[in-house]
Amino acid sequence: MASSPQTKRAASNQDRVRALLGQYGIGIVLIIMMIVIAIMEPRFLTPGNIINVATQISINGLLCYGLCLAITTGGIDLTVGAQLALTSCIIGTTMGKLGWPAFLCIVAGVGVATAFGFVDGLLIAKFNMFPFVVTLSMQLVIRGLSQVITGGQAIMLTNEWFTGIYSNKFLGIPMPIIIFVVVTIIMYLMLHWTRFGRYIFAVGGNVNAAIASGVSRFWVIVGVYTISGLLAGLASMIYTSKTGAAQSNIGIGYETDAIAAAVLGGTSFAGGIATIPGCVLGIFIIGLIYNGMNMIGVSSYYQSIVKGLIIIGAVMLDMVMNRNKH
């Protein structure tokens, strides 16, 4: 017996609700957690604390965008935390020891991070190596180089222009927030409004169909990992400006925060599914949750447990909603 139009509409609405819950269900749970934290700590949702969180999440936000692109193509980039350290060490060495102008130091550091991203993409695209293996191995290489460059010692930076990148404000808005907003706009336009963005979704959604339609998988993959390296370099610039020191041991575990924010924002490990607005939501939720747990005195050990559970929950929902693609 044929279904009535009302029945079809009801089924369609149920599917739509199920899809939304599947994509953002873990986010809803975390929003409830934020409400509970706000009740426990009245300062949590004050404008001052929100601005503080927005300033701090700029670093993880830039890393998240790189992970978003890599995951959307069906890959992963585990080097972003190590890239923070390497870029920081290059900036510190060229500025603190060689006396280069601050701007050239930033160009050198971010340039090296971008180059390593290019190499990652080249190895993955040219030799069909697994992204996990390539980026995990390169993570070790980059960490080692960071230690070699600095000898494991911190390099203090006193250049006021450079340290002002984190501490200065423009029209009353902290510079890290301005940088994050500008990069967010660029990433949104690139991913959702350009041919390259469509190619990223095509390669992640069905690589064989993408190649058959004329899309160059090679340049898409190389481009994605190069951009991820560039964003990691910019994130390191902000981080190093914040701390006023270049260190080889920074960024450990930062890739997991970026992955959590990306997946929480709806980026699918199945590939071909992602939105920049979703990433922004994930970035803010992760930042607010960590900030809230700090404010109510939750141990860092328990915070690590929460972080792991968030990633597992988000990936489980992703697997359920995209079981056919997986």
Placement of each model-derived feature along the sequence:
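Hydrophobic core segments of alpha-helical transmembrane domains in multi-pass membrane transport
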Residues: 26-39, 67, 139, 143-144, ...
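Short loop segments and helix-boundary regions at transmembrane helix junctions
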Residues: 16-17, 76, 114-155, 190-195, ...
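Transmembrane helix-bundle core of multi-pass membrane transporters
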Residues: 127, 131-194, 220-223, 242-251, ...
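Helix-loop-helix "hairpin" substructures at the membrane interface of multi-pass membrane proteins
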Residues: 100-109, 115-120, 124, 171-246
